[in-house]
Regions:
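Polytopic transmembrane helical bundles with strong interfacial aromatic enrichment
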Residues: 1-162
Length: 162
């Protein structure tokens, strides 16, 4: 696995773990301190963070099936989406705890994070699988080599038995 892909997998692990921490924080600490609407907003941020953390892990581990350039762009967009979308939702949900100002402008950047998510998925949908033929050829070659080894092994076993 290339260093770049390992970095995405580790980022996915980190974001997944962080979403569990935020989930515990929300259900044990925030639940009694913010209203239900704010708590729901916080939970949406957690959900999207976890979905995209898992996507980072899965795509990073299966990087050979995808176009390198498009995969890197998509994964970076997912990370940006988590930071902008989920981050702004966390901020908006908890702002009542630490300020009386509205910070309504933060709500205006949330859709930018959503567009990052959508863009990442569209890039993967329309162009992500350009390495599929290469992957299929490599898989076929591995299977052929494995079959040849089995055949040679059977042949040498038969010669030993004779």
């Amino acid at each position: 696995m290339k260093h770049t892909h390992r970095k995405y997998v580790k980022t996915g692990f980190f974001l997944a773990g962080l979403s569990v921490v935020f989930g515990a924080f929300g259900s044990h600490i925030l639940k009694s301190r913010i209203d239900e609407t704010a708590l729901n907003t916080f939970e949406i941020g957690i959900r999207y963070q976890m979905f995209h953390a898992l996507a980072l892990i899965i795509l990073g581990l299966n990087h050979r099936k995808f176009s390198e350039t498009k995969l890197n762009i998509a994964l970076r967009l997912m990370i940006a989406g988590v930071i902008i979308f989920s981050g702004s939702l966390y901020f908006l949900a908890t702002r009542a705890l630490w300020t009386s100002e509205s910070y309504a402008f933060v709500g205006a950047i949330t859709p930018i994070g959503g567009l990052s998510f959508i863009s990442a998925w569209l890039i993967l949908f329309f162009g992500g699988f350009s390495n599929t033929e290469k992957y299929a050829a490599e898989k076929e070659e591995l299977e052929e080599n494995s079959e040849k080894k089995r055949h040679r092994s059977k042949k040498s076993q038969a010669q030993l038995n004779d």
